[in-house]
């Protein structure tokens, strides 16, 4: 009889699965993604109570994988600034990478009392269960974009992108301006994630051909490069700052000589040679799959042809005399 009552509650929406906060904050991660309780049904990614789907305007290129993003926070967030949302301890960001219906991996960032920590989970071929894979994995996937040598990052590689000015792991995407798309901030208020809609200028969607070329290109560089290439972040010493707030042409790479020569420069002289993408180190490194040359260093094993075309057009549009 009890089973029938429970089934009735589940079918009518009167009872929903909840996140297991004890497992979430444990010192060691569980073997399976399902143990966290983020999803009522992991195979369909149907979120549990308190887990909210979201998206960002300008996503990082990840070998053409689609991404399903979710937020879990035990408290309503007050987005007073346009920095990263002030996630309390016990919060989690969940991101699943997939090609069509084929789920490949889910990455989790959890805010524990010791700071943020990231864990990679690898899905089985049936898409019914994801298992902890601290060592990462190399997969050969047959996708609609062709064969892709997909790399699941290992536990230590999370910090390769998710590192702040203090050397600590931190989220990247959930800033109000990255979330400001198609009423999403209003939805996050209604869902109890944030207290109000902050007054921010939305990050441009670099995929929108109706926007000015420069805005699209700057947004692309922000999404794919600025997690390292910004003042105070891991690539600070390069002097190449590609975040949207940067407005100094030299720090944006225009006529800027590289700090360090070597294979990464390809024998070229400046990061951006206005009017000539083929003479620009920035374009050269984006157009490479050589591990000692390519940028970004992590997160891709294929070329982003649409991104390359966008940055090439942007460089051609720059005035060589300025």
Model-derived features with residue positions:
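Extended surface/linker regions that mediate inter-domain or inter-protein docking
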Residues: 60, 66-219
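The −1 position to Zn-ligating cysteines in a subset of zinc-ribbon hairpins
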Residues: 157, 224, 294
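Sec-dependent signal peptide recognition
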Residues: 1-7
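Short conserved catalytic/interaction loops centered on acidic-Pro-aromatic/His motifs
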Residues: 169-175, 230-241
């Amino acid at each position: 009889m009890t089973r029938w009552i429970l089934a009735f509650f589940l079918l009518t929406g009167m009872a929903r699965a909840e996140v297991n906060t004890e497992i979430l904050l444990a010192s060691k991660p569980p073997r399976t993604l399902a143990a966290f309780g983020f999803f009522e049904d992991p195979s369909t990614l149907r979120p549990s109570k308190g887990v909210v789907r979201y998206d960002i305007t300008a996503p990082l290129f990840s070998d053409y994988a689609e991404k399903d993003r979710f937020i879990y926070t035990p408290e309503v967030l007050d987005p007073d600034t346009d920095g990263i949302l002030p996630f309390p301890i016990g919060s989690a960001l969940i991101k699943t990478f997939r090609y069509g219906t084929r789920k490949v991996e889910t990455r989790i960032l959890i805010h524990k009392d010791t700071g943020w920590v990231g864990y990679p989970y690898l899905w089985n071929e049936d898409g019914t269960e994801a298992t902890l894979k601290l060592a990462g994995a190399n997969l050969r996937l047959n996708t609609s974009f062709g064969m892709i040598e997909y790399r699941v990052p290992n536990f230590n590689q999370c910090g390769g992108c998710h590192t702040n000015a203090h050397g600590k792991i931190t989220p990247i995407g959930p800033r109000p301006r990255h979330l400001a798309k198609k009423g999403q901030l209003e939805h996050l208020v209604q869902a109890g994630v944030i207290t109000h809609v902050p007054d921010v200028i939305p990050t441009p969607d670099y995929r929108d051909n109706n926007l000015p070329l420069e805005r699209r290109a700057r947004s692309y560089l922000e999404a794919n490069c600025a997690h390292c290439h910004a003042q105070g972040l891991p690539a600070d010493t390069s002097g190449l700052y590609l975040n949207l707030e940067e407005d100094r042409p030299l720090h944006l790479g225009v006529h800027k000589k590289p700090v360090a020569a070597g294979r990464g420069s390809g024998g070229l002289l400046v990061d951006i040679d206005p009017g000539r993408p083929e003479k620009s180190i920035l374009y050269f490194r984006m157009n490479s799959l050589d591990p000692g040359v390519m940028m970004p260093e992590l997160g891709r094993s294929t070329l982003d042809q649409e991104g390359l075309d966008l940055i090439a057009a942007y460089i051609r549009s720059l005035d060589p005399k300025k």
